[in-house]
Each structure stands twice: as C-alpha cells, then as structure tokens.
Amino acid sequence: DMIISGGSNIYPREIEEVLLKHPAVAECSVIGRAHPEWGEEVVAFVVRRGGVTAQELDALCLEHIARFKRPRDYRFVDALPKNNYGKVLKTELRRLA
C-alpha cells in the first residue's frame, strides 16, 4: 500500500507508526484520498483511547516525519472496519474519506 502525492511516495505504515506513539491513540489506519492537484492526499482514521485533537497529532507528525507526509485530514472513529481475521478494511475507509 502506497500513497503517491505530488510525485512523492508515502508509505501509510510509516505515518501509522508515528500516530501510534501518542498514548491517546488506540489504533489508526492511513489511506490516500484523491486530490485534484496532488493526485492523492493523506487521511488518517484514528480510534481514540483518550482526549487527543487533530492539532496534537499534526504536531507529533511534524516532529517525526517530513511535512509533506503528514495527514491533511484526521477522522476520529469509534472503531476501524475489519474483516473476520482482524485486518483493517482500507477499501471501506476510502469510501468514508
């Protein structure tokens, strides 16, 4: 799984690992959403275990990854859609994005 934004390759797992460093993030998944100028933009779906804001997560991302890789949109959800084996259904997340 790879997001191509403005000609740059962005690996969702790299962003997910940064977001999971925050103690108030229970789980997350990152996808690419179509963007008219850049091809795709990064969207993060986050399940909170405590109070955390998009601004806090954005600041965390800016500390650990390049600016162009950070999510442009944070969606807070109660749970991530998963199949019977516990794998996140990114196709469902793309529909929600």
Report each predicted region and the residues it spans:
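AMP-binding/adenylate-forming catalytic core of the ANL superfamily
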Residues: D1-K69, D78-A79, N84-V88, E92-L96
